[in-house]
């Protein structure tokens, strides 16, 4: 009985650790129209290099809008973008640092939003 309880406890602990996915964004700020900003997203709790990663945003009073995506190494790290940001925004990643980036150039007032990275 003691062995069985220990085994169940171990499984619960491992499942808890596995579910602790964290994505922490940084780098926002106030800039004038035409300016630039670079956002970062630090990932943990999963094998970052295996996953496609997306940026989405939510403008004040509006719903979520997809910004763009970078695929994983197996898919050549290819990227795609929403029409509204294509040519101005660039998504990159550094698998060695478990980090995702969003370089935003030629910013417009309509780019004002809360930006989120997503797996």
Curated annotation (Swiss-Prot):
InterPro entries: Ig-like_dom, Ig-like_dom_sf, Ig-like_fold, Ig_V-set, IgHV. The keyword Ubl conjugation does not apply. Immunoglobulins are composed of two identical heavy chains and two identical light chains; disulfide-linked. This is Immunoglobulin heavy variable 3-72. Residues 53-69 are annotated as: Framework-2. V region of the variable domain of immunoglobulin heavy chains that participates in the antigen recognition. Immunoglobulins, also known as antibodies, are membrane-bound or secreted glycoproteins produced by B lymphocytes. In the recognition phase of humoral immunity, the membrane-bound immunoglobulins serve as receptors which, upon binding of a specific antigen, trigger the clonal expansion and differentiation of B lymphocytes into immunoglobulins-secreting plasma cells. Transmembrane segments: none annotated. PANTHER family: IMMUNOGLOBULIN HEAVY CHAIN. It comes from Homo sapiens. Disulfide bonds join 41-117. The gene is IGHV3-72. GO terms for cellular component: extracellular region; immunoglobulin complex; plasma membrane. Keywords: Adaptive immunity, Cell membrane, Disulfide bond, Immunity, Immunoglobulin, Immunoglobulin domain, Membrane, Secreted, Signal. GO terms for biological process: immunoglobulin mediated immune response. One of its GO terms (molecular function) is antigen binding.
């Amino acid at each position: 009985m003691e062995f069985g309880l220990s085994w169940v406890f171990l499984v619960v602990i491992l499942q808890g650790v596995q579910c602790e996915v964290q994505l922490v964004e940084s780098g926002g700020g106030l800039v004038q129209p035409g300016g630039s900003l670079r956002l970062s997203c630090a990932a943990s709790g999963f094998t970052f290099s295996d996953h496609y990663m997306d940026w989405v945003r939510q403008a004040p009073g509006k719903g979520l809008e997809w910004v763009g995506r970078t695929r994983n190494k197996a898919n050549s790290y290819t990227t795609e973008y929403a029409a509204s940001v294509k040519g101005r925004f660039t998504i990159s990643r550094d698998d060695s640092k478990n980090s995702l980036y969003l370089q935003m150039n030629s910013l417009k007032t309509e780019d004002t939003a809360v930006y989120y990275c997503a797996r």
